[in-house]
Regions:
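Short, hydrophobic-biased segments on the C-terminal half of alpha helices
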Residues: 45-46
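Key DNA-contact positions within bacterial/archaeal DNA-binding proteins
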Residues: 39
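Short amphipathic alpha-helical interface segments
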Residues: 9-21
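Alpha-helical residues within the helix-turn-helix
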Residues: 32, 49-50
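Beta-hairpin "wing" of winged helix-turn-helix
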Residues: 52-66
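Non-DNA-binding regulatory cores of transcription-related proteins
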Residues: 67-132
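A short alpha-helical element within helix-turn-helix/winged-helix DNA-binding domains
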Residues: 25-34
Length: 132
């Protein structure tokens, strides 16, 4: 399940994409448009800045801006930045499945197929697909 933090991060990114023609967007403007507490958004944008997805500046002309074009962000990348792996089971969350039961696991193919569907769905959607 995707948390509120993950959903709000996606909304912040959509808002920044919709206003990408401006220099920097003040957090208070995003908070007002998205009807999300500015205090809560401070936590979200801090994580987005530290991950390199957006840039932030304080001061008179401060605010936030996308680091790339909206079509260069996938929804999957944004969500995984905030949530971590979207894999349904721990053994699929790593590059290498080191589960000692992997060879004999009767449910692994099911989880693997589900993981691929979720990954392909979210990574197949670009931020630019979500803007108005």
């Amino acid at each position: 399940m995707i948390s509120t933090k993950g959903r709000y991060a996606l909304r912040v990114m959509i808002d920044l994409a919709e206003h990408n023609d401006q220099e920097r967007i003040p957090l208070k403007d995003i908070a007002e448009r998205q009807q999300i507490s500015k205090k809560y958004l401070e936590i979200i944008v801090r994580d987005l800045v530290s991950s390199g997805m957006i840039s932030g500046a304080s001061g008179k002309n401060g605010g936030y801006k996308l680091m790339r074009d909206p079509d260069e962000y996938s929804v999957g990348e944004i969500i995984e930045t905030m949530e971590g792996s979207l894999s349904p089971v721990a053994c699929l969350a790593c590059e290498v499945n080191d589960c000692p039961r992997a060879e004999d696991c009767q449910t692994l193919p099911l989880w693997s197929e589900y993981d691929t569907m979720v990954h392909d769905f979210f990574y197949g959607k670009k931020l630019s697909d979500l803007i108005k």
